[in-house]
Amino acid sequence: MIEALRQQLLDDPRSWYAFLRHLVASQRDSWLYTDLQRACADFREQLPEGYAEGIGPLEDFVAHTQEVIFRDPWMVFAWRPRPGRWIYVRIHREQLALEELSTDAYLQAKEGIVGLGAEGEAVLTVDFRDFRPVSRRLRDESTIGDGLTHLNRRLAGRIFSDLAAGRSQILEFLSLHRLDGQNLMLSNGNTDFDSLRQTVQYLGTLPRETPWAEIREDMRRRGFAPGWGNTAGRVRETMRLLMDLLDSPSPAALESFLDRIPMISRILIVSIHGWFAQDKVLGRPDTGGQVVYILDQARALEREMRNRLRQQGVDVEPRILIATRLIPESDGTTCDQRLEPVVGAENVQILRVPFRYPDGRIHPHWISRFKIWPWLERYAQDLEREVLAELGSRPDLIIGNYSDGNLVATLLSERLGVTQCNIAHALEKSKYLYSDLHWRDHEQDHHFACQFTADLIAMNAADIIVTSTYQEIAGNDREIGQYEGHQDYTLPGLYRVENGIDVFDSKFNIVSPGADPRFYFSYARTEERPSFLEPEIESLLFGREPGADRRGVLEDRQKPLLLSMARMDRIKNLSGLAELYGRSSRLRGLANLVIIGGHVDVGNSRDAEEREEIRRMHEIMDHYQLDGQLRWVGALLDKTVAGELYRVVADGRGVFVQPALFEAFGLTVIEAMSSGLPVFATRFGGPLEIIEDGVSGFHIDPNDHEATAERLADFLEAARERPKYWLEISDAALARVAERYTWERYAERLMTIARIFGFWRFVLDRESQVMERYLQMFRHLQWRPLAHAVPME
């Protein structure tokens, strides 16, 4: 690739020289992707007629360049020819000399933007590449996020390469399994291939429906314990799967057998920040889709575990604990209750553990997610004791959520020796532009240095990283993924990161969630809709009574509604939606806007960012005189009300708008689509993958207000003139969700992944210890001082 670029410079020096001059003339020291593409488009427009056709190779190079840094006389390019593949080069702006740069040299050049990165300056560099097993690495970017398939191949190949050792490892792995004091799979250590074959022959003489209870004693004498199946037929199937695996290992045989081992009956889910409860919390600061995701996830996982344990003949009650923070001053929520059963589940509880000061006092108030870092190590110790007391043993799987939950999951996994699964939901480094380079500017409010360090530790410690989309891992041809953004970066003056994460690591697995079908279903299923909510929805949308939690009364009720629901923070961009609506007389003439989010009275908010957004919303409504066309409600809606609200908007042939500047996944997008409501959602993040643009919904650029308003208006006009068009998009949205985004599919997939990776963890125990030690050192020497520097408010 470097030589091809060098040839381009030789073949067309005039174009390259002119383009570099064009960049220099803008008097900037750096360009990110969007700015660079705009600069290239401007350059093309300025070229003489007929000349632009010859700059195709240059434009292709620029189209795959994520960043340019000007360090006179050199232009430094971060070139990304494909997802996950990075090449750093610099080109002399006059001589057009081309040099490939090391990652360290690129990061040094980047530090120059903030006046650091001097030649010869001693800088701490952390590099994780040599601590990762090469055997876990994928090769093709099209396979990123499908680590399970790769791992099955590697494990099967490992067993096949030494059948005797492979058989021994599998049988040893089976002998380790116990639940509630009883052996599973094997009752002694004398089981071998011959005894397995003889037992399969014996089972073949029995009726398939023979219950396990009737053959239990015979099986015990043969060396087998519960876990093979609930009937003689299923036991025989499972044993034949093992025989096939031991005789001729293959990826399919390995997955099929391991997927039947009842190795998981207790799960710990960790989600610390925000207000975690089942009612009266959504829309509060730091509290949104993650809470909904985890509650639905826990219910689905419990159903899957219960079904799997029953099929395998194991009489054990599965249990899930959702660990979060206990907040004594709970503001009318249940966040002050230690243990809260989850509605809709049989044995899932929210376990709340408080933050404690060093002297043991309990912190009584809510704390911003950006300021909880000094509390986490003590919290992890307290949580460990509580979990062991509740479960009676260690959990079989720990699932961390967001930066704080993932770090605590790392600490617990390390101490308990349990498989660790991380779910980021959102990585802040991807949400705030140049937040790594300008980390010092964010220290007072966000403490990003501490958070990014925690993310780096947790993502490298995890056995499994679950994402909702490919975008989250590796982006697309033009935009980098959230995780990919942690590959090479710098916190100037603190440390540099090389190979911080490898998006080709098989630990990455895409498992997309869904929406709870009890609450989010098509508007057309009229007989199932909660008609008793009609007065409440009517008041919510069209009520004329004044209140501190609402502003605006819709004057023309005949117009369709543009609906948006989210937290009131900068990234969710509800104020941006209000502004683009206010600016567009065409859109205002076609539809009313309803925004559900935050508080309407700024005095009711305790979060600085939310207060700023509330003030901005009021300014926009005042400036554009929107009180007759925009309805803003500061309500916390439960799922039943939210689901019916989507359907009522669909009844009126409205749309749902998700205008976030960045959205890791977009549960509200799934909820709205599940209700049959056409969706317009940000192209930055998960919705780009969820929605087929123009087919099952529409992508919007939240930074381009005019284009977004026009696209909304175009659809509304087209749907008014041809009602079938609205129905086509609605039906396609319903079909898209049914095909790809359900909790049943999610739970099956995640449990399969957890079992395979649990076996991999057993096989590679020694190989993982080197990385673990490196991460321990990094945590003690780098993260801990940063965490202790955050004030304990």
Curated annotation (Swiss-Prot):
PANTHER family: PTHR45839, SUCROSE SYNTHASE 1. It holds the Pfam family SUS_N. Catalyzes the reversible conversion of sucrose and a nucleotide disphosphate (NDP) into fructose and NDP-glucose; although the reaction is freely reversible in vitro, the physiological reaction seems to be sucrose cleavage. Unlike characterized plant enzymes prefers ADP as a cosubstrate, whereas plants prefer UDP. The KM for sucrose is 45-fold lower in the presence of ADP than UDP. Its preference for ADP over UDP suggests it may directly link sucrose and glycogen metabolism. Gene3D superfamilies: 1.20.120.1230, 3.10.450.330, Glycogen Phosphorylase B. One of its GO terms (molecular function) is sucrose synthase activity. This is Sucrose synthase. Its EC number is 2.4.1.13. The keyword Transferase applies. Keywords: Glycosyltransferase, Transferase. It comes from Acidithiobacillus caldus (strain ATCC 51756 / DSM 8584 / KU). Optimum temperature is 60 degrees Celsius. Remains stable after 15 minutes at 60 degrees Celsius. Disulfide bonds: none annotated.
